[in-house]
Structure formats: C-alpha cells, structure tokens
C-alpha cells in the first residue's frame, strides 16, 4: 500500500510577513528536497493535492463569528474588532488570501485522514498541517484554522478511535 504525500503550492500563500518567525517558504524547500532525493516519485508514494476544506466542516469546530472575521480578513486588511479573535500584528498577522490558504491547509489534513481511513493509503504525510494552536473563537500561535481537530473529528465521525500524538516543542493547546 502506498504512502500519500499531500502537497499544494497554495500553502505558499501563507505570508506572515518578512519579520515573522514562521517562514512558509520552508514548505517549498521541503518539497524540493523531497523531489531531489526522489521521494516524490518512489513507486510506493502517491502525490495528492488537497481541495480547500468546506466551510461547513471548518464550522464544525470554529465559531461562525470567528469564521466571518477570517473571511473578512481574506483581502489582507484586518476588519474592525479582529484583535478580539487573535488577529493582528504579532503572531497572527492578517495577509491577502488568509482564509483561502487556511482552507487549503485544513483540506490537506482532511484528505490525509480520509486516505488512510478509507484504505487508499497506508500512511499520509501532510507537512503543512498541524496548526494545533487555533481555538474555536480565535487564532493563536501562528494558527488560524485547527486542521488537526478537523481531521480528528472527521475520523471520529466514521466511528474510528484516534490517538493524537503531538511532538511539537510546545503544547498543542487548541487540540485539548
């Protein structure tokens, strides 16, 4: 059975700005390194491109008023009151395409979960995922939409049990 490599160039739309510590070009560098080592063309690998997660799926965890703010911020300008939702200068800046990019990342985690759950892949690697600090009503720790929670809930809705093992340097507080 194959390993699914979930990849999209749309992840490059996450542009936190030149002074932000999270540099999303690392995703492109990672992909090019995987290509250089031949990992993306191995017979046991399959490259899968995600679709944006449907808003109704994102709304299964995130509050409607928070999603309204994310959508309003998609043009690159923070709407009035955005700071109440964790948006603004610092950890979670507003940038053009914020909502669109967050939906693609969430879609990648949902795709990875579904490929494994359905038996179409033995494992899946979604290296843009794991934005585990977003809360139902606010962004936190560079995370706008909690793709980990969405994938876990997707699997649980199918009656599957999930063990979430987080090996990040700090606590994935949006998942608890």
Where are these regions (language model features)?
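HDAC/HDAC-like amidohydrolase catalytic core signature
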Residues: 1-176
């Amino acid at each position: 059975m194959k390993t699914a490599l979930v990849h999209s160039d749309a992840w490059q739309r996450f542009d936190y700005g030149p002074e932000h510590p999270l540099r999303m070009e690392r995703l492109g560098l990672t992909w090019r390194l995987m290509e250089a080592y031949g990992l993306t063309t191995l017979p046991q690998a399959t490259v899968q491109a995600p679709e944006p997660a449907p808003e109704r799926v994102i709304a299964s965890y995130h509050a409607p008023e928070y999603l309204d703010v994310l959508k309003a911020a998609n043009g690159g300008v923070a709407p009035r009151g955005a700071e109440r939702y964790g948006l603004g200068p610092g950890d979670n800046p507003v940038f053009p395409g914020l909502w669109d990019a967050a939906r693609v990342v969430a879609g990648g985690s949902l795709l990875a979960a579904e490929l494994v759950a359905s038996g179409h892949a033995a494992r899946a690697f979604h290296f843009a995922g794991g934005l585990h600090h977003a809360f139902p009503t606010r962004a936190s720790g560079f995370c706008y939409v909690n793709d980990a929670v969405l994938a876990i809930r997707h699997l649980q809705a199918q009656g599957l049990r999930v063990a979430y093992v987080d090996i990040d340097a700090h606590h994935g507080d949006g998942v608890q």
